[in-house]
Amino acid sequence: MQNNEIQPSFLIQKVYTKDVSFETINSPACFKEQWNPSSDFNIDINTTKINNENFELDLTITVTTKNNETNVYIAEVTQSGIFTITGMSEEQIDSVLNTYCANTLFPYAKRIIDSSIIKGGFLPLNLAPINFDAIYLQKKSSPKREH
């Protein structure tokens, strides 16, 4: 190994909540109905290069819950982090951001979603762990759409 080679390194600089929203739809009528919920989950990951070594990742989770086909609530959080990554190729950095960094932020986002739903007067959801590696591989293997 040459002396001028940079060793791969990864550092979490900051974890923070960028945005939170919770909307109860059709209240108070929704609290009087028999509870038979179904929920849709949407996950979005956006990365921003701050400079050569620092990157911001935004993990947005949206939960839309219906009861008997009527929308009841929408909960959304954007959990963000700033990460320092050095000594890696662009492809490696992309992989680390979309997998490891997303996994790092998920527990924070999950806690906020759960808290919002409970404070909104609803039963908690059990958000299962997310396989960000599989999501990343699927995204990489999907053909890119042209607009």
Curated annotation (Swiss-Prot):
One of its GO terms (cellular component) is cytoplasm. It is found in: Cytoplasm. Keywords: Chaperone, Cytoplasm, Protein transport, Translocation, Transport. Disulfide bonds: none annotated. It comes from the Bacteria. GO terms for molecular function: unfolded protein binding. The keyword Cytoplasm applies. Its main location: cytoplasm. Gene3D superfamilies: SecB-like (3.10.420.10). One of its GO terms (biological process) is protein tetramerization. InterPro entries: SecB, SecB-like_sf. One of the proteins required for the normal export of preproteins out of the cell cytoplasm. It is a molecular chaperone that binds to a subset of precursor proteins, maintaining them in a translocation-competent state. It also specifically binds to its receptor SecA. NCBIfam families: PRK05751.1-2 (NF004391), secB (TIGR00809). Homotetramer, a dimer of dimers. One homotetramer interacts with 1 SecA dimer. Belongs to the SecB family. This is Protein-export protein SecB 2. It comes from Francisella tularensis subsp. novicida (strain U112). The gene is secB2.
